[in-house]
């Protein structure tokens, strides 16, 4: 009788183990892009759960970008579980020494030709609003000390 109980317990444990799926990690979609005009943009979205959702967020950003700017080069894209450097500062909305476009769930840092980077930042922020998001702003870097 105790072997029957043990067998039933092992069967139930086996069912539990095979149906249990661990929670997918929270990942941050990151894309780095370079334009032919000399702008380098780091794009960070809000964290999403799971690799599939993260890859979809990257695709949603990259496909329209490649259509709008076929000469732009996607330097890299990643789904990061931990952020460092520029990406961490963007995700946490910390001050940066570069121009930043901030909108709902999106942050972009932009580095480029000094005489044109401010106009680019303001233009992108305005375009984001025209595309349907409620607000977007260009955050200027702090003045040199």
What does each model-found stretch correspond to?
Residues 1-12:
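N-terminal Sec-pathway targeting helices
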Residues 14-145:
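Mitochondrial intermembrane space
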């Amino acid at each position: 009788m105790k072997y029957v109980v043990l067998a039933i317990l092992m069967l139930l444990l086996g069912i539990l183990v095979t149906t249990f799926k661990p929670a997918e990690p929270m990942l941050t979609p990151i894309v780095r892009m370079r334009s032919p005009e000399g702008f380098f943009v780091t794009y960070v979205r809000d964290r999403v759960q799971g690799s599939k959702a993260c890859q979809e967020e990257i695709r949603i950003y990259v496909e329209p970008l490649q259509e709008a700017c076929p000469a732009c080069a996607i330097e890299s894209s990643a789904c990061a579980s931990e952020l460092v450097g520029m990406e961490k500062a963007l995700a946490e909305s910390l001050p940066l020494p570069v121009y930043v476009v901030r909108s709902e769930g999106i942050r972009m840092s932009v580095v480029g030709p000094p005489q044109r980077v401010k106009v680019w930042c303001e233009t992108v922020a305005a375009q984001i609003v025209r595309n349907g998001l409620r607000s977007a702003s260009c955050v200027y870097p702090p003045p040199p000390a």
